[in-house]
């Protein structure tokens, strides 16, 4: 029996390093630092990829794109997300919606909200109304509060598409 509806949850964290922008949801956002990572460090797309993989128990982003593999050095996370979503589609499932939260003190993300949502929708070929991106702070608590990095979480609902 095919389970008709599946939920997945993912998260990702990256520390700040020298740089002049962060890439979130495929969008380059000016900032006083970059994100330390093997790929482009896009915590939004990494969390979303993990949520999609988790929904169908397909492992995690580290298993599919190990940071020890040189072919993923500096990889564009939009390409990785597209590959992950194709795994979902190949199994007969499709995204109902994604709900993503980004936690950081800086940069402020409100003015990039629609652009980030549209970027994700474009990669997945879904309507922008299926994608939610919210930004919050941790009230100066923890590593994000000390402006040492960024955290993102994602929850997805996927459903089996009868043929």
Swiss-Prot record:
It catalyses: 4-CDP-2-C-methyl-D-erythritol 2-phosphate = 2-C-methyl-D-erythritol 2,4-cyclic diphosphate + CMP. A divalent metal cation binds at residues 12, 14, 46. Its EC number is 4.6.1.12. Keywords: Isoprene biosynthesis, Lyase, Metal-binding. 4-CDP-2-C-methyl-D-erythritol 2-phosphate binds at residues 12-14, 38-39, 60-62, 65-69, 136-139, 143, 146. Binds 1 divalent metal cation per subunit. One of its GO terms (molecular function) is 2-C-methyl-D-erythritol 2,4-cyclodiphosphate synthase activity. Gene3D superfamilies: 2-C-methyl-D-erythritol 2,4-cyclodiphosphate synthase. The keyword Lyase applies. The record marks 38, 137 as: Transition state stabilizer. Pathway: Isoprenoid biosynthesis; isopentenyl diphosphate biosynthesis via DXP pathway; isopentenyl diphosphate from 1-deoxy-D-xylulose 5-phosphate: step 4/6. Signal peptide: none annotated. Pfam families: YgbB (PF02542). Its cofactor is a divalent metal cation. InterPro entries: MECDP_synthase (IPR003526), MECDP_synthase_CS (IPR020555), MECDP_synthase_sf (IPR036571). GO terms for biological process: isopentenyl diphosphate biosynthetic process, methylerythritol 4-phosphate pathway; terpenoid biosynthetic process. Homotrimer. HAMAP family: IspF (MF_00107). NCBIfam families: ispF (TIGR00151). Involved in the biosynthesis of isopentenyl diphosphate (IPP) and dimethylallyl diphosphate (DMAPP), two major building blocks of isoprenoid compounds. Catalyzes the conversion of 4-diphosphocytidyl-2-C-methyl-D-erythritol 2-phosphate (CDP-ME2P) to 2-C-methyl-D-erythritol 2,4-cyclodiphosphate (ME-CPP) with a corresponding release of cytidine 5-monophosphate (CMP). Belongs to the IspF family. This is 2-C-methyl-D-erythritol 2,4-cyclodiphosphate synthase. It comes from Acinetobacter baylyi (strain ATCC 33305 / BD413 / ADP1). The lineage of its organism: Bacteria, Pseudomonadati, Pseudomonadota, Gammaproteobacteria, Moraxellales. The gene is ispF.
